[in-house]
Amino acid sequence: MDGILIFLLSYSPGQYLVRAMQRNHLPLALALIQPDETVGDDFEELELTVNQGIHGSQDNANALLRAGIPCIYFAGSRLNGELKEFVADFGAAAKTVRQLQSMKIGIIGKLPGMGDVVTDDMAVYRRIGPEFVYDSIGTVTKFCDTVKPEEVAERVAYERTVFDVDPKMPPERHAEAVRMYIGIKRYLEANDYAGYTIHFDEFGADGRYTQLPLLAASSLMADGYGYAAEGDATTAMLMAAMVQLCGEANFSEMYMMDLKREAILLCHAGEGNYATARKDRKPFLMDRVFNEGGLSNPPTPIFAPEPGPACVMSLVHTEGETFKLVYSRGEIVDKCDLRKCDMPYMFFRPETGVRPCVKAWLEQGGTHHETVVLGEYENRIRMLCRLIGIEFVSV
């Protein structure tokens, strides 16, 4: 069981709900609906009393609030589809709360000096649920060494149906990227991780790798794993949570304000969830010159996501067990013709405008790594924040 949903059709004393809910550890929601959705001109006291659910709902909501028990509320029609949507959103949020309690995120390395990725692991564990587990690059290497050539060949053949592969790509370079993908996936599966973060310098310093795992990160995001770069376990956790809650998510960062387009260019070193790519063209798998880590060219998927409604968010740890979700709703702009951007990228147009959004992002301490969700899921994201005690801040 993931949660409890109360349908309060008539009056119920709120005081008597408190004891049971103090013993309850499941997410809670209360939906106020009525047998009749309009007041009849000839209603007598019986009809009015039968439809008096608002009376009991107020009593119960007040009692829950004063007891410090979080609850999600609905008031509306049971006939026009809005109740069905509420139940779906609450069910997804409640299930995500449960999954967060057992979630694990793998961590290998961290970029020194990057302050906004630093958090208190135990505060995350107590307030939100996931466990951050620290591993070594040797652990990943062990799993990569188990990958067989025939497994690599099968995956390479599959990827040639997914991507337009750069004709300059040496076959052995693509094969090595695939070997790393399969190995890292086995590392995640063996440890039951919902997501991971790796600092790329670990691969250059190790001496056993010839390229950075950009394709691996992109493919694992497409498989449904949470991800963030540079040891940012918080964003990897947030992405994993959004995958559970919304079905799909992406990792990126704000690269540049585009004041002319009233948009923000988002991209990262070369990772992106190509399952979100626009449907009218294949992603391009590029034999890309990239000097970070001091290694050879990493095969890099280049694409832009499907245009339409979207949101960009960041989980901020302020102090103690206090967290807030900095959230911007807007749209992915239909722009995918940057000629020399050798990374997955997107133009995000905030609903509030680029200047107010970015200014408020700074004021709220929003981090430089973000999770991106395509579609309209704000209701269930707000529910999740309320259920786990995180402030939702719209910018």
PLM regions: where:
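Beta-alpha junction/loop-to-helix N-cap segments that form part of ligand/metal-binding clefts
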Residues: M1-H25
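Periplasmic-binding protein-like
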Residues: D2-S10, A29-A31, Y193-H199
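Flexible loop/turn segments at secondary-structure boundaries
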Residues: S12-Q15, E37-T38, N80-E82, P112-D116, ...
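Short, acidic/small-residue loops that bind anionic groups at enzyme active sites
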Residues: V18-E45, V50-G56, S218-G231
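Long, internal scaffold/assembly segments composed of regular secondary structure
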Residues: V156-L245
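C-terminal catalytic subdomain
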Residues: M221-R339
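Extended hydrophobic packing segments that form well-structured cores
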Residues: G294-V395
